[in-house]
A protein has these predicted regions:
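C-terminal catalytic domains of large/alpha subunits in multi-subunit enzymes
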Residues: 2-231
Length: 231
């Protein structure tokens, strides 16, 4: 993106300052025609003259190479790891359920900001909780999706948050790839930790139903689906 921005600024300099000399950007200054102006001044002047200062592009992750025919290769730059243990309770009469406690440890590499990372882990788990316990998808007979927005399916709220929500960052995490601070992505991977909630609900159904029918519980494990499985 920086290349395209700089090209646009260069064209602006040529036109606005009536020059065709070589342009040099260095230490927050711009040099041309034996002139020196601050980069801030250039940006402000360009902005006031309605010069677009944004650009877009595509990023291609390095080292990714997968043969779709043989299914061999490297699908990801690196992996993140995590573990979660979830404790749940279910009501045998209604199918309602509640997460009592979740304990998570997650690998974020060499963390840049542990507070932000912890928040991302918590958010990813809750998002996955919605996927597996509340967000039921349905269609009409003609294939039209009826649950098309949060007004037509239930997303998790503060009420679905576990009573005890323990999150720890793996303090020996390290990314062998040359990325910023040797950190790891933490936005989406914790999403999968919520699978532990679904497995815990299946185990609860198994114990409540004397070992019967737990394999019939489908995701999302709504109160209705749990009740159907119990009876």
């Amino acid at each position: 993106g920086d290349v395209y921005k700089r090209q646009g600024l260069n064209e602006f300099i040529y036109d606005y300052f009536k020059t065709n000399s070589k342009i040099k950007y260095e230490n927050n200054f711009v040099y041309f025609d034996k002139r020196k102006i601050s980069f801030k001044e250039l940006i402000n002047t360009a902005y006031l003259n309605r010069i677009p200062l944004s650009s877009s592009g595509f990023y291609k992750t390095d080292k990714i190479n997968v043969n779709t025919k043989t299914l061999q290769g490297r699908p990801f730059l690196y992996f993140t790891y995590g573990a979660a243990v979830t404790e749940v309770i279910i009501d045998k009469l209604t199918g309602e359920n509640k997460i009592l406690q979740v304990d998570i440890i997650h690998d974020v590499g060499n963390s840049i900001n542990k507070r932000i990372d912890k928040g991302q882990i918590e958010g990813g788990y809750i998002q996955g909780l919605g996927w597996l316990t509340t967000e039921e998808v349905s269609w009409k007979s003609n294939g039209v999706l009826t649950t098309h927005s949060p007004s037509t399916y239930k997303i998790p709220t503060a009420g679905e948050t576990p009573f005890k929500f323990n999150v720890e960052i793996y303090d020996r995490g390290f990314n062998k790839e040359k990325v910023i601070n040797r950190s790891k992505a933490v936005g989406e991977p914790p999403f999968m930790l919520a699978i532990s909630s679904f497995i815990a609900l299946k185990d609860a159904v198994y114990n409540a139903n004397k070992g019967k029918n737990s394999e019939n519980l489908i995701a999302p494990a709504t109160a209705e689906n749990i009740l159907k499985t119990l009876h």
